[in-house]
Each structure stands twice: as C-alpha cells, then as structure tokens.
Amino acid sequence: MTKLAYFECPTGIAGDMCLGALLDLGVPLSLLQDYFRRLDIEQEFELQVSAVHRQSQQATYVRVELGAEPGPPGKHQHSHHRHLPEIERLILSAGLPHQAERWSLDIFRNLALAEGKVHGIEPNRVHFHEVGATDAIVDIVGTCLGLHWLGVEEMFCSALPTGGGTVKAAHGKLSVPVPAVLQLWQTRQVPVYDNGIHKELVTPTGAAIATTLAQSFGPPPPLSLHQIGLGAGTLDLSLPNILRIWLGESAASPASGTHPETVTVLETQIDDLNPQAFGYVFDALFQVGALDVFTQAVGMKKSRPGILLTVICRPETVSACETVIFKETSTLGIRRSQQQRTALQREIKTIDTAYGPVQIKLAYHDQQLVNVQPEYEDCAQIAQTHHLSWQQVYQAALLAWYQQSEIIGVK
C-alpha cells in the first residue's frame, strides 16, 4: 500500500493553504514549531492558526505574522529577504528528516530557477522577495515536514486556475499569473483553466510546491480515501476559498504489484574532464533530485577514451539536473529522452535496534515481500555515532527486522 496525497485546488494553491490543510489532517503544530526553532528563524515571525469559515465551510487558516519593518504592506512584500544559498544553508543545518529536507531544497531550487529565468540571471544571484521571505521558508519547510509526518509517498494535484488581474509585488505591479508562476507551469506543462475569478489564486510558493512534488496533474488517482484536510485562503471569493488535501492509500496492482512511471534520461559523453570532478558532479546531481547517476567507459572520436554520464531523474527536476551538468562538467550538449520504468511497490517502516531506530525499505511483488533493505543514511549515522562498522549496523538492522516481523506476523 502506498500513501497518497491529492491536492484539490478549485481556488488555487498557496503555501499557507497547504499548511492549513496539513494541520487540519492532524499534523502537530508543536512539531512544526520545534523545527522552525532549529531553522533559527522563530524570532522573525509568529504562527497564528485558527478555524474559519469560507462560504459556510469550516477550514484551518494559517497566518504567518512577520516582524514588521517600515513601509506599506503588500501581498508580495516581506520583512526578511535572503538569497537561495543562505536558505539552503538554513535547511541543511536544521536536522530535518531526510525526505522533508530533500523536498524543501527541491522546491526552493525550482522556484529559484524560475525566478532566475524571469530576470535573466543565475538562480544563486537572485535576490528576490518571494523565496527569500521568512513566510516562504515557513510555508515550504512546514509543508514538507507535514507531508513527511503523515507518511505521504506520492503526491498528485488537480489542474490549476489561472486567476487574473494584477498584484503589487517588489518589482512593481504584475499581471496575474505572475511571471514566476507561468515559468513553473511551463516547466511541468501544467493544465490550467479560467474559473472566472480574477484574483491571484496561485502564488509562486504554491506553484513551486505543486510543480515540484506532484507526479501528475489532473483528476485524482485511484485511492482508498481516509481523510480530507481543508486549508483556508485569505480572500473571500465567489467559491469557497479552500485547498483540500485528500489523504489515502493506493493498493498495488493485484497482477504484478508494480507500477509504471515516466522518467527522463539525460546523457552526455565527456573526454576532457578531470576524473576527480566526477565525484562532485554525482553529489551535486543527487542534491537537486536525480534518481540515479552512473558512468560508463566509451570510445569517442579520434579514438579518445571517454566517459558516458547518464542521469535518471523525474521530469520536474530535469532543468536542475541539466544546470548542474553544464555548470560542473565540460560538456557542450546533453541528450534528453523520456522512458517508462516499472518499480516495485515500496513501503518504509522504522525498526528499533540496539543502537537506535533505523528505517527499513520494503519492496513487494504480487503482494509478497521480496526485498528488505535498511536505509544507508540511518546505518551510516549510527555507525559514526557508536564507532561501529557500517556493515555491523546494517546486519543488526536486518536481524532486528526479521526478529520483530516474526513476532507481528509480517510476510
């Protein structure tokens, strides 16, 4: 069984609406506040949570009250601004759960790429208000923490309404959808429509969350629905201004226990790069969301020995992966292709060992457990903490899993 979240966005999506829906689903506010303290930004804002009504429907409303600075208020004007590298350092030093950390970094990097393209500069050089603001950090990191706490493994999103009109921003008055939102939509080819409401319905933060995390856009996938969380928007609209997150589970196919997915394969041959650089390239690619990276020895023109670099990634991280390849290698071009891959149904469980908790990845085929693998990062952290070999921790985790699974009757 795979835990799914479907974002239904009849009046759009914003970061505070995501937070509200997740809190409505039961995510502890204290959990979010604890991690915000670790981000060292808790002194910059106050999180206000309340139950409100939108067109007679009750939903959870979240307001990020910032420490004010002089100047007129505006929807896209924030008190605290940061560049992308500073935000990355905050996230990486906060000790977030690994998946929440990865999602948060991916969302901010995709938003930075979009803003960079809009303004014609490198993402790391963009000093832009929406990403650098404290409330964007709270919205994005809080959303990722909430999804991780709920155990969500796959996310989907409805088509998004375009909205209309204009909005005041740090760069002046902008047409809605604002340029960064359009850029994010274009990257994922998001289906959009006009619902007749001419307001800003999709914010850059909301668009970045949706385009980074959602596997696809459209109607909800087949699922067994367990809960619905309602997150309220700020405006009173002609429709209930509510984001609904459907939380449920999708069973593996009875026939095979596998599911197909679309991935993008990037390839390039290189014959003039210092071999020492490839380790750094691998790390940089995995940091921006690559699923797999590998190299092969090849013979190139003029009988030169070379390296074929292959990167497998999801469609939403193609741009970030290509940026790393162009920046960190000597290649002049990258081939891109779409492929289908079949993946076993997977599940993550936590097992207690003598050294501490370790996450275990379980894989199923024909609804039968076929593979059990302790997570590398958990084993490595315990090995370093207790001065043990990684192999010793790995074997202890496997042994603990099989012993405890026999007790509870797992097959």
Curated annotation (Swiss-Prot):
UniProtKB keywords: Nickel
Highest taxon above the source species: Bacteria
Coiled-coil positions: none
GO molecular function list: lyase activity; nickel cation binding
Pfam families referenced in this protein's UniProt entry, alphabetically: Ni_insertion
Record-linked NCBIfam families: nickel pincer cofactor biosynthesis protein LarC
Protein family membership: Belongs to the LarC family.
PANTHER family: NICKEL INSERTION PROTEIN-RELATED, PYRIDINIUM-3,5-BISTHIOCARBOXYLIC ACID MONONUCLEOTIDE NICKEL INSERTION PROTEIN
Name of this protein: Putative nickel insertion protein
Organism: Acaryochloris marina (strain MBIC 11017)
